Amino acid sequence: MSAKSTAWVQTALLALALFLLNLYICRELFRIEYLPFMGSIEGAFIGISRYIQAHWSDLTWYPLLNDGTPFPTTYPPLLNLTVALVASLRGISIAHAYHWVTALAYCLGPVALFALVLRLTASRWAAFVAGLIYSSVSMSAWLVPDIARDLGSPFFPRRLQAMVFYGEGPHVSSITLLTLALLCLDLAIAKRRAPYFLLAALAFAATATTNWLGAFAIVLIVVPYALAQLGPRGWTWRHFAWLALIGVAAYCLAMPLMPPSTIAVLQMNAKSTGGDYSSAYRSGLLWGSVILIALAAIKTAMRKLAPHLQFAVLFAFLMSLIALADAWKQIAIVPMAVRYHLEMEMALAILIAVVAHALLRDRPRWIRAASLATLLLALIVPIRMDRKYARGLLRSVDIQSTIEWKTANWLNHGWTGGRVLMPGSSAFWQGAFSDVPQLWGFDQAVTDYTIRVAEFAFYNTDPAFPQDGEDTVLWFKAFGVQAVGVAGPLSNVVWKPYRNTKKFEGLLQPIWRDGPDDVIYRVGAGPASLARVIPRNALVSKAPLHGLDVDPLRPYVAALDDLSLPRADFRWTTAHSAEISATLESNQLLSVQMAWHQGWHATANGKPTPVLRDAIGLMYIDPQIGGPSKIEMVYDGGTEMRAARVISLLTALLLVAAFIVSFSSASRSRKRPA
C-alpha cells in the first residue's frame, strides 16, 4: 500500500472512531420515538415536520400556529424537511425520524470537526484530539456553574443534554453544518474553482436554514477566520471578493426559506424571547466596535503565528466572550447569548488541539505518542460517565400517558370548533398530534406582535385585578380563540403560564377536564368561521397601548358576539387559499382572524380587492359591495417571495453551469497530451 493510501486509511479510521464513540454514547436515540421531556421544544419541530409530510406540495402558509404564518417563518425549515423526508423514506413516525436525524447530526459533529482541523493543521492527530475532546468533555460545564448544576456533574455531556432535554436538535445540527461550511470555505478560497464555490455556498445556506443561532454563528466563525488570513503573505482583496461572493450566493440560494421579512420577524421577536434583550440591540454598535478592536489587538499580538493558530485563538476568544459574559455577568452581547456555549465548546476543542499541535509538532515522536496516550487514558472515565448519563437520559415514554397527548387527542375527537390556546408544553406539542389551529406555538414565529403583548397580559395580570378574566376573554375573542386550556398547580403540564389559574371559573363553560387541574373552557358561542361580518365602524382602528388596554377591542368583540349579523362561511381550498361566502350590506366588511401578511391577495366577486391590516394585526377585506359576495383569498408570498424564488433559481443555475464548465475544462486538460 502506498504512503498516500495508508494516510487515507488512517484518516478514515480515526474519523470512524469518533463516529463510533458518539454512537456508543447516544445509540438509544436512534431507536427512540418519544422521550419523557415534554418541556422540550422538540414537540414544535415534530409538529412542523408532521405538517410537511402531509403537505409536501403546498408549503407556503402554515395555518396551525400564531394565527397563521408564512411557512418559512415557522422555523428555519431544513432540519424539519429532512425529518419529514426520512420518515417518508424509512416508513417510521415523525418523532422517531426526528430523533434519528438529530442523533446522526450529533454523531457527525465531532467527525466534521475532525475534518476541519485536519484541513487547517494537516495533522490527523491534532484533528483527532479536537474531535475527541468535543465528544467527551463539556467545557461549558466547567466554566459555567449553572450548567454544571443543570447537568448534575461537569463530567456529563452538555451537548447531548441540550439536544435531548431542551430540544436543541436544530442548534446542534447547525453546528455540525457550520463546521463543514468553514471547511468548504477554506477549500473554495484555496482552490478558487467553481465546484468548491458551490459546495461552500450550499454548506452555508444549509447552516442558515437549519437554525437561527447557527445562521448568526456563520458571522462569528467567518470573521475570526478572515482576520486570521491577514498578513504580508495572507489574503488579498481577491480572496475577500471570493468570500463575499460565496456569502451572497449562499443567501441567494437560501432566500426562499429565509426571506428578508422572515429575518425581520426574527429580529423583532429575539428582543424578548427567553428574556429582555432589547439592551443588546441598543448597545450592538458599541459592543461590535469593542469586539472588533479586541480581535484586532489579539491579531496584532499573534501576527507572526500561523493563520490556523490565529484563527483558533480568535474564534475561541469571541465565542467565550459572548457566552461567558452572559453566564457570568448577565451581559447579553447578542440575544440569547448564553446559548452559544455549545459553539464555545467546539471553539475551545479546536483551540486545545491546535495549540497542542503547535507545541508538540517539533518534539520527538515518542513524546507526541505519549501525550496522546495520556489524553486517551484521562478521557476513559469521562467517556464512561457520558455513557452512564446518556443511558439514564435516553429512555422512552408512553406518549399516550402524557397530558400533552391527552389534550391533543381530545381536540381531535371531541372538539368541533376553531382556534384554541393550550397552556405551556401542551402548546409546544399540539401540532405533533393534532391539526387544530392555535393562537400560539412558540415566540420566534409570531408575525403579529400584538399577540405577544396580549399574552403577557392575560398570563401575568395580578389575580386581584378586578377585570382580569373578562379582559382576557376579550383578547381571546378578538384573536378568534374559541377554546382555552388552563393548567393548575397539580397539572403535569410543563411550564404553567397562568398566574391566576381560576380566572375563568364561573366565566367560561368548562368542556373537558382531566384530573383536578387540567381543564379546557369554551370561549363564546359564535361560529367557528375565521371570517366574520362586522359593521365598518366596529373595526379595531386604534392599537391598544398595552395588554390591559382593551377598550379599543370592545366594539369589535361586540360585533363578533352579535349573532344577528350575517354569517360568513370560510373554507380552505388549499393550505394557502380560501373562499369566503357572505351577504354584506353597504356599511359592513369582512374581518378575517388571521395574522396579516403582504403575501395575501383577494378578489370579491371576481374583482381584485386589497387585503388590509387592522390595528391588532389581523386581516380585513372591505369589498364595498352590497348583497351576496364571494371572496377568494390566495397567499403567494407577494413580490418578495416571487423575487426570492427567481433569485434562488438563477443562482442555482449559475452555480451548476459554472460547475459543469469547470468540470469539462478539467476533463479536457487531463486528456490533452503532454
Regions found by a protein language model. Give the residues of each.
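Membrane-interface helix-loop-helix junctions at transmembrane boundaries of multi-pass membrane enzymes
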Residues: 2-5, 192-193, 232-243, 294-320, ...
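Active-site lumenal/periplasmic loops and adjacent helix-entry segments of GT-C-fold
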Residues: 18-184, 206-216, 389-398, 420, ...
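Extracytoplasmic
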Residues: 24-25, 49-53, 372-448, 545-547, ...
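Membrane-interface transmembrane helices that cradle and orient dolichyl/undecaprenyl
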Residues: 173-174, 178-196, 232-233
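Membrane-interface alpha helices of multi-pass inner-membrane proteins
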Residues: 184, 196-211, 223, 246-253
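Signature aromatic-anchored transmembrane alpha helix within multi-pass, membrane-resident enzymes
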Residues: 245-251, 357-384, 673-674
